[in-house]
Regions:
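Primary recognition of RNase H-like, Mg2+-dependent phosphodiesterase/nuclease domains
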Residues: 1-162
Length: 162
């Protein structure tokens, strides 16, 4: 896929902020990420799903963080986890997609600040050099159902020590 093709996909994602999941172009993987908080249990969860053009799940991960986070913070950590997983597997052309407008907008901008959230965003951006192509796309909750379900599941698991 050419750079113009990826740009077309990015523009389509920006315009529609889709209500459903759309596959990435050929030779590109889509990495959906999500984060959720559970303040009553003082924990948060992260979910990542990497899919190909056919919608086949190539990799996924879920993590529990045993401390409370603001939503934007856990979403930022989920984005960093997503790119870390993609780097470890060796994907080079990716679309990072999440339902947090604040995180996706911050990733697209090139501003630098010293707030806790902006430092987390910089952590996500630090992975960019690992990819030949990296696009940021926003979806609505309905376009991120699988990843959101993964996060909700991991948050529902009781803490068990073995």
């Amino acid at each position: 896929m050419t750079r113009q093709g990826l740009e077309f996909q990015r523009q389509r994602a920006i315009r529609s902020a889709q209500n459903q999941w759309f596959p990435p172009p050929t030779d590109v993987v889509k990495i959906n990420f999500d984060g959720a908080t559970c303040p009553k249990k003082r924990k948060a969860g992260i979910g990542v799903v990497i899919s190909d053009v056919n919608g086949l799940v190539l990799a996924s991960c879920a993590k529990i963080k045993h401390q409370p986070f603001k939503v934007v913070e856990i979403e930022s950590l989920a984005a960093a986890t997503a790119l870390s997983l993609a780097t470890d597997i060796g994907f080079r052309r990716v679309i990072l997609e999440g339902d947090s407008m604040e995180v996706i907008q911050a990733l697209r901008e090139n501003s630098q600040a010293l707030t806790p959230t902006s430092l987390l965003i910089e952590d996500v951006r630090s992975f960019a050099h690992n990819f030949d192509e990296l696009l940021y796309a926003r979806t609505k909750k309905d376009g991120n159902v699988v990843t959101h379900s993964l996060v909700k599941y991991v948050l529902s698991i009781p803490n068990i020590l073995v």
